[in-house]
Regions:
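Beta-propeller fold detector
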Residues: 38-41, 74-80, 114-121, 168-183, ...
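Beta-rich, blade/repeat-based domains predominating
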Residues: 41-56, 80-98, 102, 123-148, ...
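A short loop-to-beta-strand structural motif that recurs across blades of beta-propeller domains
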Residues: 65-68, 103-106, 157-160, 169, ...
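Blade-level signature of beta-propeller repeat domains, shared across WD40, Kelch, NHL, RCC1
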Residues: 321-349
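Short, conserved, GDST-rich strand-edge loop motifs in beta-rich repeat architectures
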Residues: 97-103, 181-189, 202-205, 224-239, ...
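Short loop/turn segments that connect beta-strands within beta-propeller blades
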Residues: 70-73, 108-112, 161-166, 244-248, ...
Length: 349
């Protein structure tokens, strides 16, 4: 299954890069909830991360850098092309991560960008999951003491970085046997095009890489990690893991420091706790990320999940959502996030 592994670890970053080249046609639901809060500001796109602090929203605009939204006005406050997420540290500083090929953690203070750690080198030297060496830092959360948690999607790992740039790994996520039914349906088996004909011969179930796309710190202090689930892009197979704070070198699936708190979602791309304590989980598309890549996107969702019971309810449906964040009063999400000229931020609750 070497081909499947290569697709699974690189699929997300490649898909997002490809989609910026054309407009995806989707149902008109981008104004679900309270409507756009980004006003006339035109993002370079794609939009990946969203954070809230001090009455402002901060958007990781992969085509430009970090954008601050306040009172319906947008301003680029730090140039950082390739940025995939931001996490405020205090009222003047934040962490930001970049995906492949840069693969770094940065600190931004009053608009000045400084390097903290080269995460790609850590993957090359340590390779926590022992698989193919690949790194695509995708999400970041700030911790006390100047530390940061980073979800590395291609490395299938949660990393922790000290303020001095020292990197260690917290946990790796396991493969899982998943159904190939959704893949075969999307590519049109048994009459798939030549590039996808191999999919029609796959068994009913194959191992899928987890693809750690998201991390959030819960009200209980625990660390929560969401998984996309890579090739073959199954539906209802993405999970959210709870990891005990302070954990190091855990292999989730066998370690007592990891437990699954949410199951049955599809292509998770972001996590964030709301003002009410619910875990907000973003699914980029209900038919999986592969549906988006193949131009068959339906709608994505933002869910509110109870991490005690595992129950989730849909807050809203949106086209191509990639991120969610909450202030003390409201919750916001990105929509049409991968489409140049159309990407924006909406209030959903």
């Amino acid at each position: 299954m070497r081909r499947a592994r290569a697709l699974s670890t690189r699929h997300l970053g490649r898909m997002l890069a490809v989609l910026t080249a054309f407009v995806v046609v989707l149902p008109q639901a981008a104004s679900a909830g309270g409507g756009s809060v980004s006003g006339s500001y035109e993002f370079e796109s794609p939009l990946f991360g969203l954070a809230a602090k001090g009455g402002s929203l901060f958007v990781a605009d992969g085509g430009a850098g970090v954008v601050r939204l306040r009172n319906g006005n947008g301003k680029l406050i730090a140039e950082l092309p390739g940025v995939t997420d931001v996490a405020p540290i205090d009222h003047t500083s934040m962490y930001a991560v970049t995906g492949a090929p840069d693969r770094r953690l940065y600190r931004i203070t009053d608009g000045v960008v400084s390097r903290v750690a080269y995460l790609g080198r850590f993957e090359a030297n340590v390779n926590p999951d022992g698989g193919e060496i690949d790194s695509n830092p995708f999400d970041v959360a700030a911790l006390p003491g100047g530390r940061a948690l980073v979800a590395d999607a291609a490395a299938n790992a949660l990393l922790i970085v000290k303020a001095d740039g020292t990197v260690d790994w917290v946990a790796t996520l396991p493969e899982q046997l998943v159904s190939t039914k959704n893949l075969k349906r999307l590519v049109g088996c048994p009459d798939a095009e030549p590039d996808w004909a191999f999919a029609c011969d796959l068994p009913d179930r194959i191992p899928a890489q987890p693809v750690a796309t998201s991390v959030a710190v819960g009200p209980d202090g625990a660390w929560y990690v969401g998984e996309l689930k890579g090739f073959p892009a199954p539906r209802r197979s993405s999970r959210v893991w709870r990891i005990e704070p302070g954990t190091r070198h855990a292999e989730c699936g066998s370690s007592p420091d990891c437990s699954i708190v949410v199951r049955g979602l599809t292509s998770i791309v972001d996590l964030s706790f709301g003002h009410d304590g619910a875990l907000h989980v973003v699914e980029i598309d209900e038919d999986s990320f592969l549906a988006v890549e193949l131009g068959q996107a339906t709608m994505g969702t933002v869910n509110a999940c109870d991490v005690e019971t595992g129950d989730c309810t849909v807050l809203t449906h949106l086209p191509l959502p990639t991120a969610v964040a909450s202030t003390r009063r409201h919750t916001y999400a990105t929509a049409l996030s991968l489409v140049p000229g159309e990407a924006h931020v909406v209030k959903i609750a």
